[in-house]
Amino acid sequence: EEFEAYLLEILSEYQVSIPEYGTIKALSKPIVIITSNNTRDLSDALRRRCIYNYVYYPKKELELEILQKKLPNIDLELSRQIVNFVQNLRVQDIEKKPGIAETLDWAAAISGLGLKDLSDNYKVLHSTLVCLLKTEADKAVISPEIAQKLAKI
């Protein structure tokens, strides 16, 4: 709500108030683009003042490409397994679907723990899911058995 009020001030008055500095007015009308993956609802007031665009999760091929560029030391086959797992996790009935940042964090954790294959150690696999699952409810939904199934798909 505080962030939304901040955005409304910028979009309505073309200025921003910063307690330490005062009010800063735009010299020209700003162009503001807001992207979303539906992690929060935006008010009608905010939607009226901007172009609102939904950003879909990347397709498997693009996510794999991003993973390989950001973490080039991870084996290609393990990278494929990681991306497949995350893509399959996103279709599960969870509140907070993991984004690219979570995929990268999880891949780094998996690699850092020395896993060469997601099926190497399901206990370690499940313990690292905290990188992907951000709510207690989601952690309850993705049991060790479900994680194991997702790793095999």
Enumerate the predicted regions with their spans.
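C-terminal regulatory/interaction module of P-loop NTP-utilizing enzymes
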Residues: E1-I153
